[in-house]
Amino acid sequence: MAKRKVTNKKRVVKKNIARGIIHIAATFNNTSVTITDEMGNVICWSTAGALGFKGSKKSTPYAAQQAVEDAVVKAKEHGIKELGIKVQGPGSGRETAVKSLGSIEGIKVLWFKDVTPLPHNGCRPPKRRRV
């Protein structure tokens, strides 16, 4: 009889962190939400695609709202009570994601910052779409 492989499962260590930063990256195709502590260490994350939204539904404002709510529920397990918000990208889920943070109980928003990178006339942009 063959021996069984013994695998060590990674345990999720519950941290007790009161303050954090939520990074919302809203692209044209998806919305990614990452919650870190103030040093930048990742506590939890969520994306619209990971929640089961497929194709063009990932880029909707509703999918962005669900991704934020899922990430905040995970962060509350680690003791997060106060969040700063960093938003990046031109996606359609930006405003909805930020508004949904204000309606979640037990979370206080400390500050808001838009960190979308803007070129100082760098690379040439892609050609305009003609629909």
Curated annotation (Swiss-Prot):
NCBIfam families according to UniProt: PRK05309.1, uS11_bact
The record's disulfide annotation reads: none
Complex formation: Part of the 30S ribosomal subunit. Interacts with proteins S7 and S18. Binds to IF-3.
Top-rank taxon of the source lineage equals: Bacteria
Q: Which GO terms describe its molecular function?
A: rRNA binding; structural constituent of ribosome
Keywords assigned? Ribonucleoprotein, Ribosomal protein, RNA-binding, rRNA-binding
InterPro entries the record matches? Ribosomal_uS11, Ribosomal_uS11_bac-type, Ribosomal_uS11_sf
GO cellular component assignments: ribonucleoprotein complex; ribosome
Known role: Located on the platform of the 30S subunit, it bridges several disparate RNA helices of the 16S rRNA. Forms part of the Shine-Dalgarno cleft in the 70S ribosome.
Q: What is the name attached to this protein's record?
A: Small ribosomal subunit protein uS11
One Pfam family linked to the record: Ribosomal_S11
* Family named by the database record: Belongs to the universal ribosomal protein uS11 family.
What does the entry give for GO biological process?
translation
Does the keyword field hold Coiled coil? no
